[in-house]
């Protein structure tokens, strides 16, 4: 039986003025622009929370003024990978810089995100699962 030991991930679902911040960037493995939430690898000496703050700032140019709220942690593909993804949510944001080169930020409502998913432009299954969990289970969005 084969499986890969892979890094864990953090993801942030940020919301400002009743819109979710979504980033788009070219993803080499699929050779397409993909829409997704800010996310990244949790480095060896980081917690998932530290990684989430870093990814939010690097990918969007926004900083959360309050502690990020944890959504849930789950395995991304337990039959093949050891990767866990931990999601966080915030709606208390302040703009501090520009996003990283090659990343565009967008403000979408919930309906817009569902349309992107249906058009297969929002293609990361763990991001979709985290978003669905958030809107179904978290109060006061």
Predicted regions and their residues:
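Nudix hydrolase/Nudix homology domain
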Residues: 33, 44, 70, 79, ...
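Conserved hydrophobic "DFG−1" position in protein kinase catalytic cores
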Residues: 14, 22, 89-90, 107
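Acidic, metal-coordinating catalytic segment for phosphate/diphosphate chemistry
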Residues: 1-12, 16-17
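The catalytic Nudix box helix
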Residues: 37-69, 88, 98-100, 109
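Active-site-adjacent beta-strand/loop module that shapes the phosphate/pyrophosphate-binding cleft
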Residues: 76-96, 106
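Short, glycine/serine-rich, charged loops/turns that create anion-binding
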Residues: 17-19, 27, 92
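Short basic alpha-helical hairpin corresponding to helix-turn-helix/winged-helix-like nucleic-acid-binding
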Residues: 8-11, 21-26, 30-35
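Short linear motifs in exposed loops
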Residues: 1-2, 24, 126
């Amino acid at each position: 039986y084969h499986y890969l030991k892979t890094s864990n991930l953090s993801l942030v679902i940020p919301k400002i003025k009743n819109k979710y911040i979504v980033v788009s960037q070219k993803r080499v493995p699929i050779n397409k622009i993909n829409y997704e939430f800010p996310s990244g690898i949790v480095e060896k000496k980081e917690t998932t929370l530290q990684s989430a703050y870093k990814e939010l700032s690097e990918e969007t140019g926004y900083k959360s003024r309050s502690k990020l709220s944890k959504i849930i942690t789950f395995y991304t593909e337990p039959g093949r990978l050891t990767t866990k993804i931990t999601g966080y949510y915030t709606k208390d944001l302040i703009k501090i810089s520009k996003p990283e080169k090659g990343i565009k930020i967008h403000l979408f409502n919930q309906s817009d995100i569902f349309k992107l998913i249906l058009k297969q432009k929002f293609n990361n299954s763990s991001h979709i699962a985290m978003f669905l969990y958030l809107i179904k289970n978290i109060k006061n969005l």
